[in-house]
Amino acid sequence: MKIRVAIVEDDKNYNQALKNIIDFQQNMECVAQFFNGKNALQKLEGIEPDVVLMDIQLKDLSGIDIVFKLTELMPGTSFIMCTSFENDEKIFSALRAGASGYLVKGDPLDKIVQAILEAHKGGAPMSFGIAKRVLQHFQETKVQVQTLSLLTVTEKEVLELLSQG
């Protein structure tokens, strides 16, 4: 059975390139192409794709907002962000919204094919640079927690009082 993929991308050339590479695969088919967020939001649930490739900054709506709304309605669908944004705010907002993967548009098209396969199997595909940023974020958080654990009881009490004003 083929993996059913939908594309939400307002750049018509990139949208078509994604469709072409998906349809070229024997185990995948592009079941829908959307060039704006409004149509995607209205129609995706009825199509029931296995995987959705979602741009973040569409002309009319935020791809992150669309993912947030649709993940509850479509729990069996994996959403992969496919965007040019590589900043931490966008990455973590997309993942918190329910995206299962995050790719940058500069990735080779075969990486996108592999990401679709990975997401369909329950994985969390990410571009190399994105995965590195996610790891760094958690490593920085670990250092902050370790630093707090080095404080004495009195120092922790002072910090608590300072935080309360």
Task: Tell what function each PLM region has.
Residues N36, S62-D65:
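Acidic catalytic/metal-coordinating carboxylates
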Residues K59:
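The feature encodes the CheY-like receiver
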Residues D55, T83:
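Active-site residues of response regulator receiver
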Residues I64-G76:
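Short amphipathic alpha-helix used as the core "switch/output" element in two-component signaling
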Residues Q33-V51:
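Acidic, metal-coordinating helix/loop segments flanking the phosphotransfer/catalytic sites
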Residues E9:
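Conserved acidic carboxylate
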Residues L135-L161:
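Regulatory hinge/linker segments at domain boundaries
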